[in-house]
Curated annotation (Swiss-Prot):
Region (Necessary for nucleocapsid assembly and virus assembly): 1-33
Ribosome-binding: annotated span: 112-126
High-level lineage: Viruses, Riboviria, Orthornavirae, Kitrinoviricota, Alsuviricetes
Protein name: Structural polyprotein
Organism: Venezuelan equine encephalitis virus (strain 3880)
Disulfide-bond pairs as recorded: C282-C291, C353-C457, C356-C361, C424-C438, C485-C600, C534-C560, C536-C554, C730-C751, C862-C927, C875-C907, C876-C909, C881-C891, C1072-C1084, C1114-C1189, C1119-C1193, C1141-C1183
GO cellular component: host cell cytoplasm; host cell nucleus; host cell plasma membrane; membrane; T=4 icosahedral viral capsid; viral envelope; virion membrane
């Protein structure tokens, strides 16, 4: 029939009868492992290929069970379907077997996974339950020879030996501990402090460890699990569980663990609950019962159940009671898709909508609230209609039910439309809440059409996309970077937020009133009650009836009103509904679709084009969306800038040697450091020297040149004046004597003119014509004297560059103290000189420095939500406000409302009606996910992560920089700290929001102001001690509509989010990196860390065992100053023997890259060094010998680099010798002029005085 034979993975199994074949005899034998794998593969292929299967054969001996049948029991859901189909086929051939059905139910139980099986095996003899009243209240475990049990777990350990041990209490860690007997120490857990991020195991499966926190999926682990250990893959204990708290879809665990030093550390997330099995008790009719086991449930006694829930609405076990009341005992537990069945306790309602199709109306889909605070573009609405339930109250997905004048009707959700400026996409609905994704718009409208009638409701609300990050994009990008954000959860999980419910007020139902003959008859629905109020001939009737009743006094239907009474359903506590008369039973249900932490894809702006200049950076920016550019200096004054760039621009910034950082959009920060480079040549001609120093130190260079110019000018002027004064004093006596003859020497010095000469030019002309030799002598004598004196002064003057030399004192014999800069990544090398021993090199490089302040949480603030009680309306009577006890609660009584109104209050009277309006403030539903924490910061502790090398021994360790806590390694004892500078980037008051820290002077607890940060305050997110001050003022309701109007200040939290400055992450001085969990600053380049070493004698080497240099000569082959190890020095030497020697520069002029070098008996060694000196001259210590290295350094070629300079920066570069030579020449020439003038003036004065005395 077919052109080819079909191919099968194995021969098809023939049809077998549905009854099991007789069991074959079994003989024990050992199957090869490969044969077992082939057999399992063959069986799996057969299961996937054929549908007609016989039942599994009876189980074999225990030895065969795990090999053959265990894999079959772990098949997925696809095989489950086959089993159902097989059951259907069997039903046709014979009656069902009850035992077989029971067996099938047992087989569907979930088998523990690999992690759980491993933990159960390890826990079997190392973890012991703690019993209390016959129940397991928690667990105790034996770790490292010690017994640990949570202190909050009461009861007795289920082991006689361990129960008899006397434990010690450590209340700080919530633990009790004791040493176990010696015979039990072989069976104890081992512990470890190594906790790389990843997954670990505990009794309930996998535990995720990330960012120092242990989390499990929500619902895994509960009360009674306190004391269970968390194990790694090697079976070692990494933590002990104490409790947990739900955080969205995951549960954060409170644990006790160990750090690198073996010290116990406790981590407790906020609002954590202890997981001891303590039964919560609830109350019903003065009788207590476990909240998880109520005596009644809603399906059997709805009215009584609502009353029970109302009594226990503030009980800590309300959630357990609500879940148990919804799920009646004996009812089959349904899947997780049917969570939040509690909304069957409620019903939809009609409420006033301010804008329907035509004006305001009573709408079945009135919109109560709209929220759009997430970063995913979704909108959550609360309406008077309900979703996920049909008209009968049963669960039905993608369905909306609504109240149409007392009748509950339903409609498919796809027939409901929602739109802003354009249509929205409805994602899902649950209870009173609807989740949709909407485009931007200034209003939102919901409508549906039923029986040719369109029902709609619109509310003003600005719907817009909220971008996350530092780029203001309007649509999520396809590609980009992942960033933490807040999104609306698309499920109805319990996340701790509630919406308040209460019994509905009475509603007029005209269909209950009928006219029978000449009298009025009221017929309430079956199982319900009705309140009848009539005014017939001056007679007032007010009566509650359960069955039909005739009122003969009334002859018209308009004289009577029948109010439908309901006490078996709740409605939302809306300000648009009247409150039921009397004490209203209230409750609360969970809010679905809350904000949760998630990951959003954010765009990355095009990388800026960077151009480097001398101490400057130019950024050419071309953003696609408005993007923030933030910069700061990595110095003591950050001088940060924060700018929103919307168009292509060019921005120029200056960069210093201490560093500069910029953050462009959502890109990671980039840092640059300027090098000590400049044009010109510090060793060249004067104009090159001036150009070089002008670019490096413009103000100092201008000042120096000005001073030099002033000195030269003053020198020339002073010399000229002195020469003129001396000449006049010398020639005056001879001018007054007729025919006086002037001595030749005086005439030459004073340039005296002859009798025939009248002017200088005439004198020169006379000498030129009559005596040219005298002419040249007259001109060369001053010049020769000037040259001679200048050369003499140059030889006498000693050129000394001004350097700051920081010498390191030699260490003692056993103890060594030094100081290293507190800057991550900067290596610090030193040596220990001990008499009789070779120098011991020490190298320290801090990889990370943490500054952790001690913080105290003052309060938490977030968005507030205004709660409004349904107005209490009393017709033809007066009311008073009851005492207020809720946060910022306001209460007012309004009279003269609702005259003769037929919609809502239905009052007969005109002005005697009263309404009591109440409004108060509470935390928003999304406060758990979107809130700010106000802390007070105190003294900070410092941790340094160091790479330490002492001699040939290295270690990576963490040390507390407090001057007290030592670290021991290889016999070396190291004590660090305290810091030389008690500095912290955190102010006394700080605010943490969205993973970032802000220095903000927030108001104290209880002193918040309306519209400002802290307008609502709570000690924790879940605590009930809420303080609020929002300027809430109630307004008079408008006649004709039941509502509670009010005015209120805008949210101070929202205003603070808009106005807040950049966080410390972008503005902290000294380049600090700010992190949270815990709040800390890392790698702040400020201050120095004192170090004290205690070094054992075993690490020292005798001098006789080390080489000694007999001759050494140092030459600088290449030297670039202010560059990372830009200097290369070659040392030619002759040593007594080969070996290893420590090298060190005692002064701070140079920083060496090498800590030790290998020496031969004769040769040369190359050493790399860094220096900030233009003309370095330093002594290099090699073992116990010293050699001097000196030379000239040139500036680096690169103006800007991407890493800091790895050398000491405690001094600036010196002035070059060339510059000093030119400077002294200039100043020396000016001094010579002054000296010559003074000498001449002195000679002339002495001659004049002598001549006068002689005369």
């Amino acid at each position: 029939m077919f052109p080819f034979q079909p191919m099968y993975p194995m021969q098809p199994m023939p049809y077998r009868n549905p009854f099991a074949a007789p069991r074959r005899p079994w003989f024990p034998r050992t199957d090869p492992f490969l044969a077992m794998q082939v057999q399992e593969l063959t069986r799996s292929m057969a299961n996937l290929t054929f549908k007609q299967r016989r039942e599994a054969p009876p189980e074999g001996p225990p030895a065969k069970k795990p090999k053959r049948e265990a894999p079959q029991k772990q098949k997925g859901g696809g095989q489950g379907k086959k089993k159902k189909n097989q059951g259907k086929k069997k039903a046709k051939t014979g009656p069902p077997n009850p035992k077989a059905q029971n067996g099938n139910k047992k087989k569907t139980n979930k088998k523990p996974g690999k992690r759980q099986r491993m933990v159960m095996k390890l826990e079997s003899d190392k973890t012991f339950p703690i019993m209390l009243e016959g129940k397991i209240n928690g667990y105790a475990c034996v770790v490292g020879g010690k017994l640990f049990r949570p202190m909050h777990v009461e009861g007795k350990i289920d082991n006689d030996v361990l129960a008899a041990l006397k434990t010690k209490k450590a209340s700080k860690y919530d633990l009790e501990y004791a040493d176990v007997p010696q015979n039990m120490r072989a069976d104890t857990f081992k512990y470890t402090h190594e906790k790389p991020q990843g997954y670990y195991s505990w009794h309930h499966g996998a535990v995720q460890y990330e960012n120092g926190r242990f989390t499990v999926p929500k619902g895994v682990g509960a009360k009674g699990d306190s004391g269970r250990p968390i194990l790694d893959n090697q079976g070692r204990v990494v933590a002990i569980v104490l409790g947990g708290v739900n955080e969205g879809s995951r549960t954060a665990l409170s644990v006790v663990m160990w750090n690198e030093k073996g010290v116990t550390v406790k981590y407790t997330p906020e609002n954590c609950e202890q997981w001891s099995l303590v039964t919560t008790m609830c109350l019903l009719a003065n009788v207590t019962f476990p909240c998880a086991q109520p005596p009644i449930c809603y399906d059997r006694k709805p009215a009584e159940t609502l009353a029970m829930l109302s009594v226990n609405v503030d009980n800590p076990g309300y959630d357990e009671l609500l879940e148990a009341a919804v799920k009646c005992p004996g009812r089959k537990r349904r899947s997780t898709e049917e969570l939040f069945k509690e909304y069957k306790l409620t019903r939809p309602y009609m409420a006033r909508c301010i804008r329907c199709a035509v004006g305001s109306c009573h709408s079945p889909i009135a919109i109560e609230a709209v929220k759009s605070d997430g970063h995913d573009g979704y909108v959550r609405l609360q309406t008077s209609s309900q979703y996920g339930l049909d008209s009968s109250g049963n669960l039905k997905g993608r369905t909306m039910r609504y109240d149409m004048h007392g009748t509950i009707e339903e409609i498919p959700l796809h027939q409901v439309s929602l739109h802003t400026s354009r249509p929205c996409h409805i994602v899902d609905g649950h209870g009173y809440f609807l989740l949709a994704r909407c485009p931007a718009g200034d209003s939102i409208t919901m409508e549906f059409k039923k029986d040719a009638v369109t029902h709609s409701c619109s509310v003003p609300y600005e719907v817009k996309f909220n971008p996350v990050g530092r780029e203001l994009y309007t649509h999520p990008p396809e590609h980009g970077a992942e960033q933490a954000c807040q999104v609306y959860a698309h499920d109805a999980q319990n996340r701790g937020a509630y919406v308040e419910m209460h019994l509905p007020g009475s509603e007029v139902d005209s269909s209950l009133v009928s006219l029978s003959g000449s009298s009025v008859t009221v017929t309430p629905p079956a199982g319900t009650s009705a309140l009848v109020e009539c005014e017939c001939g001056g007679t007032k009737i007010s009566e509650t009836i359960n069955t039909a009743k005739q009122f003969s006094q009334c002859t018209k239907k308009e004289q009577c009103r029948a109010y439908r009474l309901q006490n078996d359903k709740w409605v939302y506590n809306s300000d648009k509904l009247p409150k039921a008369a009397g004490a209203t039973l209230k409750g609360k249900l969970h809010v679905p679709f809350l904000l949760a932490d998630g990951k959003c894809t954010v765009p990355l702006a095009p990388e800026p084009m960077i151009t480097f200049g001398f101490r400057s950076v130019s950024l050419k920016l071309h953003p696609k969306n408005p993007t923030y550019l933030t910069t700061r200096q990595l110095a003591d004054e950050p001088h940060y800038t924060h700018e929103l760039i919307s168009e292509p621009v060019v921005r120029n910034f200056s960069v210093t040697e201490k560093g500069w950082e910029f953050v462009w959009g959502n890109h990671p920060p980039k840092r640059f450091w300027a090098q000590e480079t400049a044009p010109g040549n510090p060793h060249g001609l004067p104009h090159e020297v001036i150009t070089h120093y002008y670019h490096r130190y413009p103000m100092s260079t201008i000042l120096g040149l000005s001073i030099c110019a002033a000195i030269v000018t003053v020198s020339i002027a002073a010399s000229t004046w002195l020469l003129c004064k001396s000449r006049v004093s010398c020639l005056t006596p001879y001018r007054l004597t007729p025919n006086a003859r002037m001595p030749l020497c005086l005439a030459v010095l004073c340039c005296a003119r002859t009798a025939r000469a009248e002017t200088t030019w005439e004198s020169l002309d006379h000498l030129w014509n009559n005596n040219q030799q005298m002419f040249w002598i007259q001109l060369l004598i001053p010049l020769a004297a000037l040259i001679v004196v200048t050369r003499l002064l140059r030889c006498v003057c000693c050129v000394v560059p001004f350097l700051v030399v920081a010498g390191a004192a030699g260490a003692g014999a056993y103890e060594h103290a030094t100081t290293m800069p507190s800057q991550a990544g900067i290596p610090y090398n030193t040596i220990v000189n001990r008499a009789g021993y070779a120098p011991l090199p020490i190298s320290i490089t801090p990889t990370k420095i943490k500054l952790i302040p001690t913080v105290n949480l003052e309060y938490v603030t977030c968005h507030y939500k205004t709660g409004m009680d349904s107005p209490a309306i009393k017709c033809c009577g007066s009311q008073e406000c009851t005492p207020t006890y809720r946060p910022d609660e306001q209460c007012k009584v309004f009279t003269g409302v609702y005259p003769f109104m037929w919609g809502g209050a239905y009052c007969f009277c005109d002005t005697e009606n009263t309404q009591v309006s109440k409004a108060y403030v509470m935390k928003s539903d999304d406060c758990l996910a979107d809130h700010a924490e106000a802390y007070k910061a105190h003294t900070a502790s410092v941790q340094a992560f160091l790479n330490i090398t002492v001699g040939e021994h290295s270690i990576v360790t963490t040390v507390y920089v407090n001057g007290e806590t030592p670290v021991n390694f290889n016999g070396v004892k190291l004590t660090a700290g305290p810091l030389s500078t008690a500095w912290t980037p955190f102010d006394r008051k700080i605010v943490q929001y969205a993973g970032e820290i802000y220095n903000y002077d927030f108001p104290e607890y209880g002193a918040g102001q309306p519209g400002a940060f802290g307008d609502i305050q709570s000690r924790t997110v879940s605590s009930s001690d809420l303080y609020a001050n929002t300027n809430l003022v109630l307004q008079r309701p408008k006649a004709g509509a039941i509502h509670v109007p009010y005015t209120q200040a805008p949210s101070g939290f929202e205003q603070w989010k808009k106005d807040k400055a950049p966080s410390l992450k972008f503005t902290a001085p000294f380049g600090c990196e700010i992190y949270t969990n815990p709040i800390r600053a890392e790698n702040c380049a400020v201050g120095s860390i004192p170090l004290a070493f205690d070094i054992p004698d075993a690490l020292f080497t005798r001098v006789s065992e080390t080489p000694t240099l007999s001759a050494a000569e140092c030459t600088l082959n290449e030297c670039v100053y202010s560059s990372d190890f830009g200097g290369i020095a070659t040392v030619k030497y002759s040593a007594s023997k080969s070996g290893k020697c420590a090298v060190h520069v005692p002064s701070g002029t140079a920083t060496l890259k090498e800590a030790a070098i290998e020496l031969a008996e004769q040769g040369s060694a190359t050493i790399h060094f860094s220096t900030a000196n233009i003309h370095p001259e330093f002594r290099l210590q090699i073992c116990t010998s010293y050699v001097t290295c000196k030379g000239d350094c040139h500036p680096p070629k690169d103006h800007i680099v991407t890493h800091p300079q790895y050398h000491a920066q405690t001094f600036t570069a010196a002035v070059s010798k060339t510059a000093w030579t030119w400077l002294t020449s200039l100043l020396g020439g000016s001094a010579v002029i002054i000296i010559i003038g003074l000498v001449l003036a002195t000679i002339v004065a002495m001659y004049v005085l002598t001549n006068q005395k002689h005369n």
